[in-house]
Every structure is written in structure tokens, then in C-alpha cells.
């Protein structure tokens, strides 16, 4: 008898912040839970979230997500007032928060959201401690990426 594999519909990723990896060097990554309301969970299940313009602030020993947009569904409850850009609390362990506070206080470092995804039934936010890139760093990244693509193309044609 063989065991049945668990069915995983679609991708677990809800939203990605591609600008973060383009504009910053990611030094360290953390996984944070989100404190959400019911209509927000429905929006996430429908994939209607945007974290590209969002940022994270540390206040009073807690971390908060600002600027993330969760578009409410039309079928969401009518008696609940939906605020798409509401500030959401991040759920982190004390040790992780202490590490984030120490990292964010260093000169030139910030905390950016990287991706929003499902982990089992829970919505998780991957956040990173990041240092800003200069313009020449971005150009170097583009050069290496283009060279990698050209190299793959050359190798593909060389095998023919």
C-alpha cells in the first residue's frame, strides 16, 4: 500500500517584493506571523495583496507592517469596515525582536518585507535586515545576471 501525497493547490507565495532585492543587500532573514482580520485572510486566499510599497517600523518593542495593501473582496462582510492599508502587527519572538532592534539601529540598515506566503494555514511574512545598494552595485548585479544568461545560452548552443 502506498501513502497518498498531500494535495497542495497552487503556489504558497501570495506576494513578493522584488524591488527589495534590487535596492538592498539582504543580510539576514526572519519569518514573522501577521495579526490579521477575517476579511484580510479572505483577500490573501484570493491573492489580492501588495507589499511592494510597504515598510516595517519598530515601535514600543513591537514590529509593525505599514503600507501593505490587502484589497477587500466584494463578497466580504458588509458590517465590517475594511481599511486596505491598515497597520498590521508582526508576530515575532522576543529574541528575534531584540535582534531586529539591534540591526535596525546600525547605520545604513533597515528592515524590509520580502515576501508574503502561506505556511500550512498561517500567513507568514519574510522580512530581511537590509543595507541599501549604491548605483554601481545595481549595475554590477545586472552585469552578472546578463553574463549568467549569456553563458547558459552559449552552453545550450554548444551542445548542439
Swiss-Prot record:
Required for rescue of stalled ribosomes mediated by trans-translation. Binds to transfer-messenger RNA (tmRNA), required for stable association of tmRNA with ribosomes. tmRNA and SmpB together mimic tRNA shape, replacing the anticodon stem-loop with SmpB. tmRNA is encoded by the ssrA gene; the 2 termini fold to resemble tRNA(Ala) and it encodes a 'tag peptide', a short internal open reading frame. During trans-translation Ala-aminoacylated tmRNA acts like a tRNA, entering the A-site of stalled ribosomes, displacing the stalled mRNA. It is found in: Cytoplasm. The lineage of its organism: Bacteria, Pseudomonadati, Pseudomonadota, Gammaproteobacteria, Enterobacterales. HAMAP family: SmpB (MF_00023). Keywords: Cytoplasm, RNA-binding. PANTHER family: SSRA-BINDING PROTEIN (PTHR30308:SF2), TMRNA-BINDING COMPONENT OF TRANS-TRANSLATION TAGGING COMPLEX (PTHR30308). GO terms for cellular component: cytosol. This is SsrA-binding protein. Residues 137-153 have a biased composition (Basic and acidic residues). Its main location: cytoplasm. Belongs to the SmpB family. It holds the Pfam family SmpB.
Amino acid at each position: 500500500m502506498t501513502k497518498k501525497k498531500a494535495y497542495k493547490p497552487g503556489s504558497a507565495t501570495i506576494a513578493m517584493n522584488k524591488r527589495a532585492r534590487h535596492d538592498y543587500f539582504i543580510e539576514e532573514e526572519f519569518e514573522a506571523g501577521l495579526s490579521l482580520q477575517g476579511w484580510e485572510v479572505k483577500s490573501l486566499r484570493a491573492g489580492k495583496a501588495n507589499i511592494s510599497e510597504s515598510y516595517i517600523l519598530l515601535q514600543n518593542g513591537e514590529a509593525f507592517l505599514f503600507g501593505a495593501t490587502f484589497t477587500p473582496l466584494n463578497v466580504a462582510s458588509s458590517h465590517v469596515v475594511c481599511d486596505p492599508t491598515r497597520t498590521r502587527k508582526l508576530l515575532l519572538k522576543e529574541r528575534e525582536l531584540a535582534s531586529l532592534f539591534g540591526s535596525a539601529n546600525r547605520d545604513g540598515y533597515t528592515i524590509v518585507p520580502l515576501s508574503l506566503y502561506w505556511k500550512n494555514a498561517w500567513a507568514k511574512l519574510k522580512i530581511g535586515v537590509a543595507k541599501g545598494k549604491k548605483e554601481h552595485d545595481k549595475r554590477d548585479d545586472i552585469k552578472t545576471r546578463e553574463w549568467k544568461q549569456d553563458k547558459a545560452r552559449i552552453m545550450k548552443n554548444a551542445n548542439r
